Design a protein with these regions (language model features):
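Divalent metal-coordination and catalytic microenvironments
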Residues: 39, 78, 91, 121, ...
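Bacterial Sec-dependent N-terminal signal peptides
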Residues: 1-20
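Sec/Tat-exported extracytoplasmic proteins
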Residues: 29-32, 36, 40-43, 64, ...
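Histidine/acidic-residue-rich, glycine-tolerant segments that coordinate divalent metal ions
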Residues: 106-116, 123, 141-261, 266-270
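Metal-dependent amide/peptide-bond hydrolase catalytic core
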Residues: 62, 231-406
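Acidic/His- and Gly-rich active-site-bordering loop/insert found
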Residues: 19-117, 126-142
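Acidic-glycine-rich active-site phosphate/pyrophosphate-binding loop
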Residues: 94-107, 202-212, 374-380
Length: 406
């Protein structure tokens, strides 16, 4: 009954909008673009989104939206009440940038050295700010909208808390209690003006692992006096990749192991004492994730021991699997199709990306969808996320505002 009443509320909420909403959205497109450019020019890392959160809070306050600052470090929560009491729907965007030096020579290129919005969070914020403006000017709906601007989606710095987990811990889904939550992620490789969705598991879980390989240091000219941690590390890297290719049933669900950092040694003629590895595990099945974690430990320790060395493995779970509620998706598809057009709402495959948005979905129903950000008329290829060349087309954001508003 709870879910049924929530669904009925959605239809009341959508039905209340006048036909002029679409015109209003078109009228603020340049505003949305300018917000995105501003955020892109002034990116801030996880748990350091000070300027970013202030810009957002001031915008929401200017709309007459009740604002709470510093939720989960720098998170912003805005509450907009409709004409009557009713259910509470949350809309979420993430705010943090990445430690990447931008190579896009744009008028709004990052001015913060070594920091870049390379995953589209600048557009997520701009889209949700646009939706907040439209909804604040059209309060003839029943219920309440809670705008959640969250920091540290990419993960808080070592030794700090942050992200969705901390916002939930600090009560972002309460006072008033949220009945359902919706969010989007723009994707640079997908054609713009299209929306992509998947019921059940959509984005993968994410785990971070570190492996310290300890050997015996020696002169590069006398390797027989060493236990070479670089050789051990090479064997560990190759063997760990066989966990996916030879031990995982990929017809069941996809899984990925990637190494992001290998660090060891400080001089060409010294065999170092240790090498450190850092990597990520992605899986859409918790049983598979647990098996991969177990095998990483077994292989690392076993290989190191066989060479006379030692491996110390630490694995920390990050985001859970992003589980989209199938019933809510089915009931919301008419709204998506109304916003984007029937042919532009596309059933997607599962992705081995990860999103801490999953933690909200562990608490309440909702879903995350993808928004295409690539202009197929572009002469250059669509860039990968988390790279210095990442970009999205500004005009792709308009559909995002439309969907989040509807």
């Amino acid at each position: 009954m709870k879910k049924l009443s929530l669904i009925i509320f959605f239809f009341i909420f959508q039905f209340s909008f006048s036909q002029s909403i679409e015109d209003q959205i078109k009228n603020i497109e340049q505003k949305v673009i300018s917000w995105r450019h501003d955020f892109h020019k002034h990116p801030e890392l996880s748990n350091r989104e000070f300027r970013t959160s202030d810009v957002i809070a001031k915008h929401l306050e200017s709309l007459g939206i009740s604002v709470k600052r510093n939720v989960g470090v720098n998170g912003i929560v805005g509450i907009l009440k409709g004409r009557k009491d009713g259910k509470v729907v949350a809309l979420r965007a993430d705010m943090d940038a990445l430690p990447i030096t931008e190579k896009n020579y744009l008028p709004f290129m990052s001015i913060n050295e070594g920091i870049m919005h390379a995953c589209g969070h600048d557009s997520h914020m701009a889209i949700l700010m646009g939706a907040a403006e439209i909804l604040s000017n059209n309060r003839n709906f029943e219920g309440t909208v809670k705008f959640i601007f969250q920091g540290a989606e990419e993960g808080p710095p070592p030794g700090e808390e942050g992200g969705a987990k901390m916002m939930i811990k600090e009560g972002v889904l309460n006072n008033p209690d949220v009945n359902a939550i919706f969010g989007l992620h723009i994707t640079a490789q997908l054609p713009m003006n299209k929306v992509y969705y998947k019921p059940k598991g959509f984005y993968a879980s994410s785990s971070r692992f570190t492996i310290k390989v300890i050997g015996t240091q020696a002169h590069g000219g006398t390797p027989w006096l060493s236990v070479d941690p670089i050789i051990i590390t090479a064997q560990i890297i190759n063997s760990i990749q066989t966990i996916i290719s030879r031990e995982s049933e990929l017809t069941k669900e996809p899984a990925v192991i990637s190494f992001g950092k290998v660090e060891g040694g400080n001089r060409f003629n010294i065999i170092p004492n240790e090498v450190n590895l850092v990597g990520t595990i992605r899986s859409l099945d918790y049983g598979m994730r647990d098996y991969i974690k177990k095998r990483i430990i077994e292989l690392s320790e076993g290989i190191a021991k066989s060479y006379g060395g030692k491996a110390i493995v630490e694995i920390d779970d990050g985001a859970d699997i992003t589980y989209n509620d199938p019933e809510i998706i089915n009931k919301m598809l008419p709204s998506l199709k109304k916003s984007a057009g029937n042919e532009n709402v596309i059933l997607s495959n599962a992705k081995t990306l990860a999103e801490d948005y999953a933690y909200y979905l562990n608490e309440i129903p909702g879903f995350l969808f993808e928004l295409g950000g690539y202009n197929t008329n572009e002469k250059r290829e669509a860039p990968a996320h988390h790279t210095p060349d990442f970009f999205i087309d500004d005009s792709s954001m308009l559909l995002g505002v439309k969907v989040m508003t509807n």
